[in-house]
Amino acid sequence: MEQQNKRGLKRKALLGGVLGSGGLAMAGCEVSPPGGMIGDFLRMGWPSGITPEAVSMGNFWSWVWVAAWIIGIIMWGLMLTAIFSWNAKKAEKRGEGEFPKQLQYNVPLELVLTIVPIIIVMVLFFFTVQTQDRVTALDKNPEVTVNVTAYQWNWKFGYGELAPEFAPAGGDYDGVDEARQASAEASKIDPSGNNPIHGNSKKDMSYLHFNQIETLGTTDEVPVLVLPTNTPIEFNLASADVAHSFWVPEFLFKRDLYAHPEANKSQRVFQIDEIFEEGAFVGRCAEMCGTYHAMMNFELRTVDRETFAEYIAFRDANPDATNAQALEHIGEAPYATSTAPFVSDRTGTRDGENFQTPA
């Protein structure tokens, strides 16, 4: 009897240890998950990240799946063991009663099955908060500030502050367009006046940013946002109308954009340490925003730091030049390569080819 009790305690300890190790596997927030086909499977459709913040989220996501599979296999194993080991037919063949021996009120086992899940949830919560804090932290020293304005159904990107290395004339650079910014400020509504929605109005554009160097999307041309690699970057977001959402899938992160973000208690700024991969990455609006929401794409084009400085210098020296001309100047494809403009009329979408190639 004493030996059976010892065996039972050993089994419970083993079960607790295995379940606990599943919880501790969640602690792999900064440990790279397996690569190859196993890594692809664990990502469950998530793309590879191109920022340190995205890598942190991707690693955490993969290790949560590792822990979930460990716990799932254990629980499925216990369930199947119970199904096939203790059933009425086998008991009848053995000459036993219809029901197996009842083992309720096993206090040690109940404690294990209560405490271990609590520990797993606590570990998961801890590393969720840790990863979230890293992703949302505003502790970088950004060398490029991008002002993002969303509107139905396109995007406007403007360059605000730039580090001296990227500034056209060197030194500190503030890319604000003073005339248009002053006009926007003049539209501000007096909150003490007799105005709708607590003093805010859609005519009030004072919260938006207007810059000297901007890229504006149109129905015929997907806007291409050019950014440097290996550079801390800040994104300042706002909507000119309804709620939108700025999403680059390779960031593994999205942030909603609102009109009057401060009044709506929303954080309009996020930062990234760097983008460590050059290339073209599609960006999308991830918030249902009306009729042509599905067509509201943009492209993120990342280049090295020297090429980005050349791009900014060309845009500054040639204010009437298009973004396509600036991209050609630095040896890049002039139009988006990861997505294409959509045909917006109903008749143009019936053949399944609902996109167009820029002229």
Swiss-Prot record:
Chief location: membrane
Binding-site positions, Cu cation A2:
285, 287, 289, 293
For biological process, the GO terms are: ATP synthesis coupled electron transport
Tell me what topology the record assigns in the membrane: Multi-pass membrane protein
Protein name (record): Cytochrome c oxidase subunit 2
EC category? translocase
Q: What does this protein do?
A: Subunits I and II form the functional core of the enzyme complex. Electrons originating in cytochrome c are transferred via heme a and Cu(A) to the binuclear center formed by heme a3 and Cu(B).
- Covalent lipid sites (S-diacylglycerol cysteine): 29
What the entry lists under PANTHER family is as follows: CYTOCHROME C OXIDASE SUBUNIT 2, CYTOCHROME C OXIDASE, SUBUNIT II
- Annotated Cu cation A1 binding lies at 244, 285, 289, 296
Per the record, what is one GO cellular component?
plasma membrane
**The keyword Lipoprotein is annotated on this UniProt entry:** yes
Q: Which gene encodes it?
A: ctaC
Q: Which residues form the signal peptide?
A: 1-28
- Transmembrane parts of this sequence: 64-84, 107-127
This enzyme's EC code(s): 7.1.1.9
Quaternary structure annotation from Swiss-Prot or TrEMBL? Associates with subunits I, III and IV to form cytochrome c oxidase.
From which source organism is this entry? Corynebacterium efficiens (strain DSM 44549 / YS-314 / AJ 12310 / JCM 11189 / NBRC 100395)
Q: Which UniProt keywords apply?
A: Cell membrane, Copper, Electron transport, Lipoprotein, Membrane, Metal-binding, Palmitate, Respiratory chain, Signal, Translocase, Transmembrane, Transmembrane helix, Transport
